[in-house]
Amino acid sequence: MSLQVSRSLRVVAYSLRTALTFCSPRPCVPSAAAVRSLRTGSALLSVRKFTEKHEWITTEEGIGTVGISNFAQEALGDVVYCSLPEVGTKLKKQEEFGALESVKAASELYSPLSGEVTEVNEALAENPGLVNKSCYEDGWLIKMTLSDPSEMDELMSEEAYEKYVKSIEE
């Protein structure tokens, strides 16, 4: 019995020595790539802001990415056409910037913030159904610079938006 305990202790001691030799005495600092991947993971929803007209926006380094909410895409049904602005278009908060058409309805799109369009999701021209398949990732609509980033404070958090949707469904 004592022989088994002795062997077990030697194995544990060896494991600890091996583990400690691989530990760096410097503090662990995540790389920029690791931080970027964390930001684009599940935490992304916590920084997404919503409008009462069901658009969402996320920002990174002064550029906003705009799309429609899951609630909106479900209400629309299968999106068959997207009308989006040209790059360089200047938008004011709540200004109409395009439209989505589905088999059962059409819906105007409104800018959640003031700014200038820097990119349009060209993939939607050939595959507008991306809005339905991936409204928060591949189905984004436009990217824009922000004229007044403080306007973000006036938008709803994900939690507030969920409460808002529940209130209008009742």
Curated annotation (Swiss-Prot):
SUPFAM superfamilies: Single hybrid motif (SSF51230). Residues 63-145 form the Lipoyl-binding domain. The keyword Transit peptide applies. Its cofactor is (R)-lipoate. One of its GO terms (cellular component) is glycine cleavage complex. The keyword Amino-acid biosynthesis does not apply. It comes from the Eukaryota. Binds 1 lipoyl cofactor covalently. GO terms for biological process: glycine decarboxylation via glycine cleavage system. It holds the Pfam family GCV_H. Residues 1-45 form a transit peptide. It is found in: Mitochondrion. PROSITE patterns: BIOTINYL_LIPOYL, LIPOYL. Keywords: Lipoyl, Mitochondrion, Transit peptide. The modification N6-lipoyllysine is found at K104. InterPro entries: 2-oxoA_DH_lipoyl-BS (IPR003016), Biotin_lipoyl (IPR000089), GCV_H (IPR002930), GCV_H/Fam206 (IPR033753), GCV_H_sub (IPR017453), Single_hybrid_motif (IPR011053). The glycine cleavage system is composed of four proteins: P (GLDC), T (GCST), L (DLD) and H (GCSH). Interacts with GLDC. The glycine cleavage system catalyzes the degradation of glycine. The H protein (GCSH) shuttles the methylamine group of glycine from the P protein (GLDC) to the T protein (GCST). Has a pivotal role in the lipoylation of enzymes involved in cellular energetics such as the mitochondrial dihydrolipoyllysine-residue acetyltransferase component of pyruvate dehydrogenase complex (DLAT), and the mitochondrial dihydrolipoyllysine-residue succinyltransferase component of 2-oxoglutarate dehydrogenase complex (DLST). Belongs to the GcvH family. This is Glycine cleavage system H protein, mitochondrial.
